[in-house]
């Protein structure tokens, strides 16, 4: 049975990442520092982490959303609802005006999921053509 709990240091290390996460790790010097830079959560299945996510709170009224998941996420629609509810609660608690996420465009499932969460294309990263920024205003 899946449960959601506050993120604990090292939870992400116990997840067998999907290809999209393995690619993202190549771009992040120290993921743990980023993962604890704001409210975050871990979804566990039978006590083992399968999804971690959170929002890095910025000083300009916005936040950077992140998600680190195993293939488990693709079999459980309830994760989308949990992530949406977490996101909306953080936006409300911190009175955020917008959220953004950097997306590897080679993974269409991620783009569809962001559409469901009402994020839209905002910009491309000049130095990394395969990455786009998607944003949602509140």
Spans of features found by a protein language model:
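Short amphipathic alpha-helix that is part of the acyltransferase structural core
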Residues: 1-29
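A short helix-loop-beta-strand connector motif used in the catalytic cores of GNAT acetyltransferases and
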Residues: 32-42, 48-51, 95
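Conserved beta-strand in the GNAT
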Residues: 42, 47-57, 62-66
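Conserved acetyl-CoA binding element of GNAT-fold acetyltransferases
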Residues: 60-74, 132
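Conserved glycine-rich acetyl-CoA-binding loop
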Residues: 71-85
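Conserved acyl-CoA
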Residues: 82-98
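Conserved beta-strand-loop-alpha-helix junction that forms the acyl-donor binding cleft
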Residues: 96-115, 125-128
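C-terminal "cap" of GNAT-fold acetyltransferases
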Residues: 127-138
């Amino acid at each position: 049975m899946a449960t959601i709990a506050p993120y604990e240091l090292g939870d992400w290390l116990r997840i067998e990442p999907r290809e999209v996460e393995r690619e993202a790790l190549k771009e992040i010097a120290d993921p743990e520092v980023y993962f604890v830079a704001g409210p975050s959560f871990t979804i566990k299945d039978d006590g083992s982490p399968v999804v971690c996510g959170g929002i890095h709170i910025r000083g300009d009224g916005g936040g950077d959303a992140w998600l680190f998941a195993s293939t488990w996420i693709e079999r459980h629609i309830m994760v989308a609802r949990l992530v949406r509810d977490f996101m909306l609660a953080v936006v409300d608690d911190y009175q955020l005006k917008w959220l953004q996420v950097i997306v590897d465009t080679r993974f269409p499932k991620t783009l569809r999921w962001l559409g469901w969460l009402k994020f839209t294309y905002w910009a491309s990263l000049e130095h990394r053509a395969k990455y786009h920024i998607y944003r949602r205003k509140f």
